[in-house]
Amino acid sequence: MTTSDLPAFWTVIPAAGVGSRMRADRPKQYLDLAGRTVIERTLDCFLEHPMLRGLVVCLAEDDPYWPGLDCAASRHVQRAAGGVERADSVLSGLLRLLELGAQADDWVLVHDAARPNLTRGDLDRLLEELAEDPVGGLLAVPARDTLKRADRDGRVSETIDRSVVWLAYTPQMFRLGALHRALADALVAGVAITDEASAMEWAGYAPKLVEGRADNLKITTPEDLLRLQRSFPH
């Protein structure tokens, strides 16, 4: 499948979190990564893709860092109000897409603001494998280490079969209307939603797992940032 055969898509980037585990003076998406902020590098892969229709970044109220970035002035990038939880931010982003002319059956890719090492190859693979899928899915990586379940005392209660375990990454790709309904209904029901796929699962869907690169890391700790520094030219 050539690039022109890939489906057009919209992107939502929830970026209202503070990243307290980084112990930094600013949210982790605004930390320096080889001379540019993390979020700028995160957006690059999407803004350089010819099938992108538009991108919405969901920001905290009075975010002082975003306005000073070059990408904030891009005609492809719009803002939406971030929420208390990830699901709230994504819902806000989906509503903004509808205001921009997106349709309920359009594809939307939701991606972590602090996951800056997404490759064009992984993005194209996700788009190609899900282009005709009735549900959608997500990039994921098969578990490679032995997995243990712990009891309340921190002791091993069982060994889990890793052949059926995958690590959920992003982007996660679903139809706008279906994802909006799943997130909204889950929030009303008080269901704990950790990512978009979990909302779709709760709504009765079975998202498809698309294998991606293990180095598509989400920055959570200072060690993660240090590891990714080596991936980008200075």
Swiss-Prot record:
Transmembrane segments: none annotated. GO terms for molecular function: 2-C-methyl-D-erythritol 4-phosphate cytidylyltransferase activity. It catalyses: 2-C-methyl-D-erythritol 4-phosphate + CTP + H(+) = 4-CDP-2-C-methyl-D-erythritol + diphosphate. Pathway: Isoprenoid biosynthesis; isopentenyl diphosphate biosynthesis via DXP pathway; isopentenyl diphosphate from 1-deoxy-D-xylulose 5-phosphate: step 2/6. The keyword DNA-binding does not apply. The keyword GTP-binding does not apply. The record marks R21, K28 as: Transition state stabilizer. InterPro entries: IspD, IspD/TarI, IspD/TarI_cytidylyltransf_bact, ISPD_synthase_CS, Nucleotide-diphossugar_trans. PROSITE patterns: ISPD (PS01295). Its EC number is 2.7.7.60. The record marks R162, K218 as: Positions MEP for the nucleophilic attack. GO terms for biological process: isopentenyl diphosphate biosynthetic process, methylerythritol 4-phosphate pathway. Belongs to the IspD/TarI cytidylyltransferase family. IspD subfamily. NCBIfam families: ispD (TIGR00453). HAMAP family: IspD (MF_00108). This is 2-C-methyl-D-erythritol 4-phosphate cytidylyltransferase. It comes from Pseudomonas aeruginosa (strain UCBPP-PA14).
